Amino acid sequence: MVLSPADKSNVKAAWGKVGGHAGDYGAEALERMFLSFPTTKTYFPHFDLSHGSAQVKGHGKKVADALTNAVAHVDDMPNALSALSDLHAHKLRVDPVNFKLLSHCLLVTLAAHHPADFTPAVHASLDKFLASVSTVLTSKYR
């Protein structure tokens, strides 16, 4: 999915407002995903999935760091996320549908924390951005 200049601007501005809360938001989105889509828990059998778990917080930070990297390299996400794509496709073998589920939970989390900033245009831009990230992460499944 091609991001327009306006989309890129919206994504960078929205992610900039996340600031130091990125890891917390990542963990919150994971918790939402585990509660809303229980089948996603199967990829984390070794995790304590309870609220506030250090493992969920740690993985939430990894998710947030990957998204921060994608925002910083929005014009070259395939190269920026190549190692992560390899990991999810070849080692972890995560079903691609799970990226869509996590993307949805991230959008809900961002909207809950920044309702005034979560305009329809920003929502659409973030949705396109997360779809692009998902496409990159699943590109090596083929």
UniProtKB/Swiss-Prot annotation:
GO terms for molecular function: haptoglobin binding; heme binding; iron ion binding; organic acid binding; oxygen binding; oxygen carrier activity; peroxidase activity. The modification N6-acetyllysine is found at residue 17. InterPro entries: Globin, Globin-like_sf, Globin/Proto, Hemoglobin_a-typ, Hemoglobin_oxygen_transport, Hemoglobin_pi. GO terms for biological process: hydrogen peroxide catabolic process. Disulfide bonds: none annotated. The keyword Nucleotide-binding does not apply. O2 binds at residue 59. It comes from the Eukaryota. Residues 2-142 form the Globin domain. Red blood cells. Keywords: Acetylation, Heme, Iron, Metal-binding, Oxygen transport, Phosphoprotein, Transport. The keyword Metal-binding applies. It holds the Pfam family Globin. The modification Phosphothreonine is found at residues 109, 135, 138. Heterotetramer of two alpha chains and two beta chains. Involved in oxygen transport from the lung to the various peripheral tissues. Belongs to the globin family. This is Hemoglobin subunit alpha. The gene is HBA.
